[in-house]
């Protein structure tokens, strides 16, 4: 889980590498493009990531400036991945005891 708020941006990203692909996307872009970049490609990136890595990913974000909103989503996502893959101790990081 990576969650943060700034002056005008709120975002939350939850990630689970549990072997099933699922994307919950609650982000509404108010522009089709940021410069030459189609904003719809942001969701496409995360959907493709979920499919290829078989993870559950939930992204909720809102804000005014679409460029900064996309940056905030990717930053929260990167923090989430860093926490998810960090090795701590020797125990298996699973409530079921297996991965």
Name these PLM-found stretches.
Residues 25-33, 90-99:
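Solvent-exposed, glycine/polar-rich loop segments of beta-barrel outer-membrane systems
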Residues 20-24, 34-89:
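Mixed-charge, glycine-accented linear interaction segment located at domain edges/termini
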Residues 10-14, 18:
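Beta-strand-rich assembly/attachment modules of structural machines
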Residues 1, 14-15, 23, 57, ...:
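Generic detector of leucine side chains in alpha-helical contexts
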Residues 3, 14, 46-48:
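A generic local secondary-structure boundary/capping motif
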Residues 1-5, 9:
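Single conserved hydrophobic/aromatic residue that forms the stacking wall/gate
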